[in-house]
Amino acid sequence: MIALIQRVTHASVMVDNQLIGEIGAGLLVLLGVERGDDEQKAKRLCDKVLGYRVFSDEEGKMNLNVRQSGGSVLVVSQFTLAADTQKGMRPGFSRGAAPDEAERLYTHFSDACRASGITTATGCFAADMQVSLLNDGPVTFWLQV
């Protein structure tokens, strides 16, 4: 399971010109679910994302996690993160989880974020989405479990 996290000052997601998720300062989490992923991996990745210290403290050092910073999380499914790009000029998607399993684990991950007490917005699984963000830094990390 892969999370591409970006520290943002704000982020939003639209489907069919309708706003469906929006946050202020916090983390945009692009989530890719791979074959073999399970609830345990989703929970581990959630804990890692929410605990990852990417926000600045009073001294300007990245010592605070999203909770400590008072931020929110926007979780957006992105199956292309599971792409195999090693060969050729076209990505392969055989490493990605089947859609029904990916949706189940995406929901599990999002629910785990909410259960932790973090304000969590989401995109719409498998929809054609337009994601807007203002990357703060820029600060972007690839996390994988």
Curated annotation (Swiss-Prot):
Coiled coil: none annotated. Keywords: Cytoplasm, Hydrolase, RNA-binding, tRNA-binding. The keyword tRNA-binding applies. It is an enzyme of class 3 (hydrolase). A motif (Gly-cisPro motif, important for rejection of L-amino acids) lies at residues 137-138. It is found in: Cytoplasm. GO terms for biological process: D-amino acid catabolic process. Its main location: cytoplasm. It comes from the Bacteria. Gene3D superfamilies: D-tyrosyl-tRNA(Tyr) deacylase. Pfam families: Tyr_Deacylase. Its EC number is 3.1.1.96. One of its GO terms (cellular component) is cytoplasm. It catalyses: glycyl-tRNA(Ala) + H2O = tRNA(Ala) + glycine + H(+); a D-aminoacyl-tRNA + H2O = a tRNA + a D-alpha-amino acid + H(+). PANTHER family: D-AMINOACYL-TRNA DEACYLASE 1, D-TYROSYL-TRNA TYR DEACYLASE. Homodimer. A Gly-cisPro motif from one monomer fits into the active site of the other monomer to allow specific chiral rejection of L-amino acids. An aminoacyl-tRNA editing enzyme that deacylates mischarged D-aminoacyl-tRNAs. Also deacylates mischarged glycyl-tRNA(Ala), protecting cells against glycine mischarging by AlaRS. Acts via tRNA-based rather than protein-based catalysis; rejects L-amino acids rather than detecting D-amino acids in the active site. By recycling D-aminoacyl-tRNA to D-amino acids and free tRNA molecules, this enzyme counteracts the toxicity associated with the formation of D-aminoacyl-tRNA entities in vivo and helps enforce protein L-homochirality. Belongs to the DTD family. This is D-aminoacyl-tRNA deacylase. It comes from Edwardsiella ictaluri (strain 93-146). The gene is dtd.
